[in-house]
Regions:
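Lumenal/extracellular ectodomains and adaptor appendage modules
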Residues: 2-186
Length: 186
Protein backbone atom coordinates (compact mmCIF):
# COMPACT_ATOMS: atom_id res chain seq x y z
CA UNK A 1 0.00 0.00 0.00
CA UNK A 2 1.11 3.52 -0.71
CA UNK A 3 1.19 6.17 2.01
CA UNK A 4 -1.63 8.70 1.70
CA UNK A 5 -3.41 6.61 -0.93
CA UNK A 6 -7.11 6.05 -0.33
CA UNK A 7 -7.89 2.37 -0.51
CA UNK A 8 -10.96 1.31 -2.47
CA UNK A 9 -12.45 -0.30 0.62
CA UNK A 10 -11.65 -1.26 4.20
CA UNK A 11 -12.55 -4.58 5.81
CA UNK A 12 -14.33 -3.37 8.94
CA UNK A 13 -15.04 -6.91 10.10
CA UNK A 14 -14.43 -10.41 8.77
CA UNK A 15 -15.89 -13.51 10.42
CA UNK A 16 -14.49 -16.86 9.28
CA UNK A 17 -15.86 -20.25 10.31
CA UNK A 18 -14.14 -23.47 9.24
CA UNK A 19 -15.44 -26.96 9.91
CA UNK A 20 -12.67 -29.53 9.48
CA UNK A 21 -13.94 -32.94 8.38
CA UNK A 22 -12.27 -36.29 9.18
CA UNK A 23 -11.22 -36.67 5.53
CA UNK A 24 -9.37 -33.33 5.57
CA UNK A 25 -12.12 -31.41 3.83
CA UNK A 26 -12.58 -27.83 5.06
CA UNK A 27 -16.07 -26.31 4.94
CA UNK A 28 -15.39 -22.56 4.94
CA UNK A 29 -17.85 -19.72 5.54
CA UNK A 30 -16.74 -16.06 5.40
CA UNK A 31 -18.80 -12.95 6.21
CA UNK A 32 -17.38 -9.59 5.11
CA UNK A 33 -18.43 -6.17 6.38
CA UNK A 34 -16.74 -3.74 3.99
CA UNK A 35 -16.67 0.04 3.80
CA UNK A 36 -16.18 1.29 0.24
CA UNK A 37 -14.40 4.66 0.11
CA UNK A 38 -15.40 5.31 -3.48
CA UNK A 39 -17.60 3.68 -6.08
CA UNK A 40 -16.61 0.20 -7.21
CA UNK A 41 -18.43 -2.24 -9.45
CA UNK A 42 -17.54 -5.31 -7.37
CA UNK A 43 -15.63 -6.97 -4.54
CA UNK A 44 -13.12 -9.67 -5.50
CA UNK A 45 -12.01 -12.53 -3.25
CA UNK A 46 -9.03 -14.65 -4.36
CA UNK A 47 -9.12 -18.16 -2.89
CA UNK A 48 -5.71 -19.78 -3.12
CA UNK A 49 -5.41 -23.46 -4.11
CA UNK A 50 -1.62 -23.64 -4.39
CA UNK A 51 0.54 -23.37 -1.27
CA UNK A 52 4.34 -23.14 -0.97
CA UNK A 53 4.80 -24.56 2.55
CA UNK A 54 8.02 -24.63 4.61
CA UNK A 55 8.73 -28.09 6.05
CA UNK A 56 11.57 -28.92 8.45
CA UNK A 57 13.47 -32.03 7.35
CA UNK A 58 16.80 -33.61 8.28
CA UNK A 59 18.30 -31.41 5.53
CA UNK A 60 16.84 -28.27 7.11
CA UNK A 61 13.85 -26.25 5.97
CA UNK A 62 12.64 -27.07 2.48
CA UNK A 63 9.62 -25.73 0.65
CA UNK A 64 7.07 -28.08 -0.82
CA UNK A 65 4.25 -27.16 -3.14
CA UNK A 66 0.77 -28.45 -2.39
CA UNK A 67 -2.47 -28.15 -4.31
CA UNK A 68 -5.73 -28.10 -2.34
CA UNK A 69 -8.75 -28.00 -4.71
CA UNK A 70 -11.50 -25.47 -3.97
CA UNK A 71 -15.06 -26.49 -4.84
CA UNK A 72 -18.70 -25.65 -4.19
CA UNK A 73 -18.20 -21.86 -4.17
CA UNK A 74 -21.39 -20.03 -3.23
CA UNK A 75 -22.12 -16.44 -2.28
CA UNK A 76 -25.07 -14.20 -1.52
CA UNK A 77 -24.10 -11.62 -4.17
CA UNK A 78 -22.06 -13.80 -6.52
CA UNK A 79 -21.36 -12.34 -9.97
CA UNK A 80 -18.71 -14.73 -11.32
CA UNK A 81 -16.15 -17.42 -10.46
CA UNK A 82 -13.00 -17.79 -12.55
CA UNK A 83 -10.36 -20.44 -12.01
CA UNK A 84 -6.65 -20.51 -12.79
CA UNK A 85 -3.60 -22.49 -11.67
CA UNK A 86 -3.38 -20.48 -8.42
CA UNK A 87 -6.99 -20.83 -7.31
CA UNK A 88 -10.36 -19.20 -7.76
CA UNK A 89 -11.25 -15.56 -8.32
CA UNK A 90 -14.70 -14.83 -6.92
CA UNK A 91 -16.37 -11.57 -7.91
CA UNK A 92 -19.31 -10.32 -5.84
CA UNK A 93 -21.62 -7.36 -6.13
CA UNK A 94 -24.84 -6.57 -7.95
CA UNK A 95 -25.22 -6.53 -11.71
CA UNK A 96 -25.38 -2.95 -13.01
CA UNK A 97 -24.90 -1.41 -9.55
CA UNK A 98 -21.98 0.51 -8.06
CA UNK A 99 -20.90 -0.27 -4.51
CA UNK A 100 -20.24 2.50 -2.00
CA UNK A 101 -20.35 2.85 1.78
CA UNK A 102 -21.00 -0.16 4.04
CA UNK A 103 -21.64 -3.42 2.20
CA UNK A 104 -21.95 -7.01 3.43
CA UNK A 105 -20.94 -10.13 1.55
CA UNK A 106 -20.89 -13.80 2.45
CA UNK A 107 -19.17 -16.66 0.69
CA UNK A 108 -18.82 -20.38 1.36
CA UNK A 109 -16.65 -23.02 -0.25
CA UNK A 110 -15.03 -26.40 0.31
CA UNK A 111 -11.27 -27.01 0.34
CA UNK A 112 -9.93 -30.56 0.00
CA UNK A 113 -6.67 -30.68 1.95
CA UNK A 114 -4.36 -33.67 2.15
CA UNK A 115 -1.73 -35.23 4.39
CA UNK A 116 1.33 -32.99 4.16
CA UNK A 117 3.71 -35.92 4.82
CA UNK A 118 5.63 -34.36 7.67
CA UNK A 119 9.01 -36.04 8.36
CA UNK A 120 8.39 -36.97 12.02
CA UNK A 121 5.02 -38.63 11.32
CA UNK A 122 3.17 -35.65 12.77
CA UNK A 123 0.22 -34.20 10.96
CA UNK A 124 -0.13 -30.59 9.96
CA UNK A 125 -3.28 -28.83 8.91
CA UNK A 126 -2.37 -25.72 6.96
CA UNK A 127 -4.60 -23.10 5.45
CA UNK A 128 -4.74 -19.42 4.81
CA UNK A 129 -7.66 -17.51 6.27
CA UNK A 130 -7.35 -14.45 4.08
CA UNK A 131 -5.31 -13.96 0.93
CA UNK A 132 -4.74 -11.12 -1.50
CA UNK A 133 -6.66 -8.44 0.35
CA UNK A 134 -4.58 -5.40 -0.50
CA UNK A 135 -6.37 -3.23 2.01
CA UNK A 136 -6.74 -2.59 5.71
CA UNK A 137 -8.45 -5.26 7.85
CA UNK A 138 -9.73 -3.64 11.06
CA UNK A 139 -11.16 -6.73 12.75
CA UNK A 140 -11.18 -10.45 12.07
CA UNK A 141 -12.70 -13.27 14.12
CA UNK A 142 -12.17 -16.92 13.30
CA UNK A 143 -13.56 -20.17 14.62
CA UNK A 144 -12.26 -23.56 13.53
CA UNK A 145 -14.11 -26.71 14.53
CA UNK A 146 -11.84 -29.76 14.49
CA UNK A 147 -13.34 -33.24 14.03
CA UNK A 148 -11.77 -34.60 17.23
CA UNK A 149 -9.54 -33.72 20.18
CA UNK A 150 -5.99 -32.49 19.55
CA UNK A 151 -2.99 -31.16 21.45
CA UNK A 152 -3.61 -27.40 21.93
CA UNK A 153 0.14 -26.87 22.40
CA UNK A 154 0.55 -27.70 18.70
CA UNK A 155 -1.64 -24.84 17.45
CA UNK A 156 0.13 -21.80 16.02
CA UNK A 157 -1.25 -18.65 14.43
CA UNK A 158 0.47 -15.88 12.51
CA UNK A 159 -0.16 -13.28 9.84
CA UNK A 160 1.77 -11.58 7.08
CA UNK A 161 2.28 -12.31 3.44
CA UNK A 162 4.44 -15.32 4.26
CA UNK A 163 3.04 -16.03 7.74
CA UNK A 164 6.06 -14.30 9.20
CA UNK A 165 4.34 -11.94 11.66
CA UNK A 166 3.75 -13.36 15.14
CA UNK A 167 1.41 -12.26 17.94
CA UNK A 168 -1.17 -10.51 15.77
CA UNK A 169 -3.91 -13.13 16.22
CA UNK A 170 -5.28 -14.29 19.53
CA UNK A 171 -5.90 -18.00 19.87
CA UNK A 172 -7.85 -20.01 22.36
CA UNK A 173 -8.85 -23.66 22.42
CA UNK A 174 -12.10 -24.85 23.96
CA UNK A 175 -12.59 -28.59 23.43
CA UNK A 176 -12.23 -29.16 19.70
CA UNK A 177 -12.81 -25.47 18.79
CA UNK A 178 -9.97 -23.08 17.96
CA UNK A 179 -10.98 -19.42 17.89
CA UNK A 180 -9.47 -15.99 18.03
CA UNK A 181 -9.40 -12.41 16.91
CA UNK A 182 -7.08 -10.01 15.17
CA UNK A 183 -5.24 -8.07 17.89
CA UNK A 184 -4.34 -5.10 15.69
CA UNK A 185 -5.42 -3.94 12.25
CA UNK A 186 -3.58 -5.44 9.30
Amino acid sequence: RTANAVEAYTVENLDITIQVQEDGKLLVFEEYDLNFNYYRSSFTRNITSTYHIPVTTTQGVVYRDYYFPVRDIQGDRLLSVERNEDGSIVTMGEEGMQLTGRQKFSISYTVQTSDLQMPDQSQMLYWTLVTNLDTRVNHLHYEIEMPKAFDPQEVYTNTGKYGDVKNTLSMQVNGNIISGDLLQPL
